[in-house]
Design a protein with these regions (language model features):
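Alpha-helical, coiled-coil/dimerization segments enriched in small aliphatic residues
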Residues: 91-93, 220-249
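Bacterial Sec-exported substrate-binding components of ABC uptake systems
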Residues: 2-8, 18-73, 180-211, 326-332
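Structured C-terminal subdomain patch of bacterial secreted/periplasmic proteins
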Residues: 165-169, 175, 263-332
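A local structural motif
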Residues: 45, 57-62, 97-106, 235-245
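Acidic/His-rich segments in extracytoplasmic proteins that coordinate ligands and/or metal ions
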Residues: 89-176, 255-258, 262-264, 271-282
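Bacterial Sec-type N-terminal signal peptides, specifically the leucine/valine-rich hydrophobic h-region
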Residues: 13-16
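Short helix-initiation/N-cap motifs at beta->coil->alpha
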Residues: 52-54, 106-114, 244-252
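Extracytoplasmic strand-loop-helix segments at the start of, or within, the mature domains
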Residues: 62-91
Length: 332
């Protein structure tokens, strides 16, 4: 009797085991997938595709090793919630940019960034400017695109002149970082403040103005196609350089005196702002007719802070608008 009982028990045990092994296997796809493939799969899910300002299609996936080759772009990337491993020199030396990423390396001056330094940082995303070097140079970061792409490094080119350009840049950056709160704080709220300032512009006033950047070697006049010129246009100002295009190439005090604008805005440029301002003051002092200008007599000859009107003000763009509005209309 005991033998029969033991036999039945053994058969039952085998039956249970058979049922267990006949069940569908657990989903072990993720566990058996190599780590590199898992990372690639996760990256594909986080990938963001966009068109840069040169018309290039760019795709990046949650980049963690980002190099920004212009100070304002480095600042904007951090404002959008990103971190950096490399920046151009001006990101660390120019006033107004407080780079917070730890142990960030430099890749050279933005007018002539070093390709080898960039690649050595093993970036997974490089942010570059589509403009030329400036400062009288003709270098271009666009020339480095082929080398970066052939090295498997995603690179995007941007050009920011107006606030709308900055807003578009921040939208792209925030889409990549996924930090919508950062976009709201450092872009959308700034836009709201600017719209509030613009809504206060008197409809029946259109003051005339000239904007000049001065450096130790001379002076240049800005049109409405520049950063400060665009802000003035938004605030109802008539830029006389738009109507007298020769001023953009050949600046002369005599032309300014003849036009007699209501406002003259001066932006010191270069490493030595004091020397730049002194050069212009010396030139104006030598011309007795300068003091007869309406802008000079009415206290409307204004030197603007380069942090707000030469470098891109980014999250402080509304402050730039406010300074101009107060100068134009706040003292009336």
């Amino acid at each position: 009797m005991k033998k029969i009982t033991f036999a039945l028990a053994a058969l039952l045990a085998l039956g249970v085991a058979g049922c267990a092994t006949s069940q569908e296997p657990a989903n072990t796809e993720g566990a058996n997938q190599p780590a590199a493939e898992q990372a690639a799969t996760a990256g594909a899910e986080d990938a963001v595709a966009f068109t840069d300002d040169l018309g290039n299609e760019v795709t990046v996936a949650n980049p963690q090793r980002v190099v920004a080759c212009m100070g304002s772009f480095a600042n904007a990337w951090e404002l959008a919630g990103g971190t950096l491993v490399g920046v151009s020199d001006d990101a660390l030396t120019a006033e107004g940019f407080a780079i917070e990423s730890p142990d960030v390396a430099t890749v050279g001056d933005f007018t002539n960034v070093n390709l080898e330094s960039i690649i050595a940082l093993e970036p997974d995303f490089v942010i570059m400017t589509s403009g030329t070097g400036g400062r009288g140079g003709d270098s271009s970061q666009v020339d480095l695109r082929e080398a970066l792409v052939s090295s498997g490094i995603p690179v995007a080119y941007f050009e920011v002149t107006t606030f709308d350009d900055y807003l578009r840049l921040m939208r792209t950056f925030a889409d990549i970082t996924g930090d919508e709160a950062a976009y709201e704080q450092n872009a959308a709220s700034v836009q709201q403040a600017i719209e509030g300032i613009k809504s206060q512009v008197p409809a029946d006033e259109a003051p005339t103005a000239l904007v000049m950047t001065t450096y130790s070697g001379g002076t240049r006049v800005q049109s409405s196609g520049t950063m400060t010129g665009a802000m003035l246009a938004d605030l109802g100002v008539r830029n006389l350089a738009d109507e007298n295009r020769s001023l953009l190439k050949d600046f002369s005090l005599e032309s300014v005196i003849e036009l007699d604008p209501d406002f003259i805005f001066v932006i010191p440029m270069g490493n030595d702002a004091e020397a730049a301002t002194a050069a212009l003051n010396e030139a104006t002092a030598a011309n007795p007719a300068w003091n007869s200008l309406s802008a000079v007599q009415n206290g409307h000859y204004v030197t603007l802070d380069p942090k707000l009107f030469l470098s891109k003000p980014n999250a402080n763009w509304d402050e730039s608008y406010q300074v101009l509005y107060d100068t134009l209309y706040g003292q009336n």
